[in-house]
Amino acid sequence: MRHAADALLTGIGTIVADNPLLTDRSGRSRRRRLLRVILDSQLRLSPQSQIVKTADDDLLVFTAASLDSPKARKLQRAGVELVRARARGGRIDLQAVLIELGRRDILSVLLEAGPTLNGTALEARLIDKFVLFYSPKIAGDGKVPFAHARRLNRNPLERVQARQIGPDLCVEAYPLTPRR
């Protein structure tokens, strides 16, 4: 899936929790380099994180924090492009982020995030397609893929398909409610 996207979007919570690389490991040639995009209102991104250590003009961070701080300058020297963004209630304005990505000719965005950012995108009706993976575990951590998951009932899905990929279950579906 990462191979098919122009950009991969995540929140700082995912970066802090998992320290991922967020790269396309398909081994296939790409039309353009995968742009890794992080929403980080307070600029909590560590210069020591794997994603920063592998930054090579492919890491874009939207933040409401000052771009003149020593930490911001250190991240910029490491190859991170910082973009000042509006924040409401401590969260980066997702609609404004997508507009900026569109200005950069980013046409497809893969959202790989935690429940808060997933829930925000869901509530704003910014999701075209859902692809959810479930691992076959009897007991889990009780986390849900979307914050405010009860509101999913107001967003019915259609064309639901499920298939097994290795040991995991992959569910694909499309929102029935038209996007804004």
PLM features: residue spans?
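Enzymes that bind and transform nitrogen-containing heteroaromatic metabolites
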Residues: M1-R180
